[in-house]
Amino acid sequence: MADANSADALTVKSNVSPAFSIYYLLMVHDHMMYFGDKALVKRHLPAIDGILGFFDRNLSEQGLVGKSGGPIMRHRYWSFIDGAGVWDSGVPAATGKGSGSVTMESLLYLYGLQKAAELAEFAGRTDTAAEYRQRAGALSDAIRTYCFE
């Protein structure tokens, strides 16, 4: 079996990284900014709603993104942040300690909510845009409260 830090680790087992889904949302936003393609945005909004719903369902009591995964091959979801050699398969050591909340995942979710609000507004879904902005505000408050001294 492949080591979790080896080059072929990704091919050994199913690997789902919720954080990568935020990058998909950001690509749709980039497309909107460059091309103004409302039809494409409308086509992708249901998937974006689902992505943001996953993160919303995984908020901790503090309002941060709670532990939804960990290192690849040992958890259902892969909490990949960066390929730093000192981290176990791209996951910060802090993920396994305390609350398990990963500040970077909360920050990614916040950025995703902000950009999804712009997408929803662009597509004429003003109620959804307002909801995403409200969720972003609550998450931003939680990040300021719990992630910084």
PLM feature spans:
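Well-ordered alpha-helical segments within folded domains of soluble proteins
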Residues: 18-30, 102-117
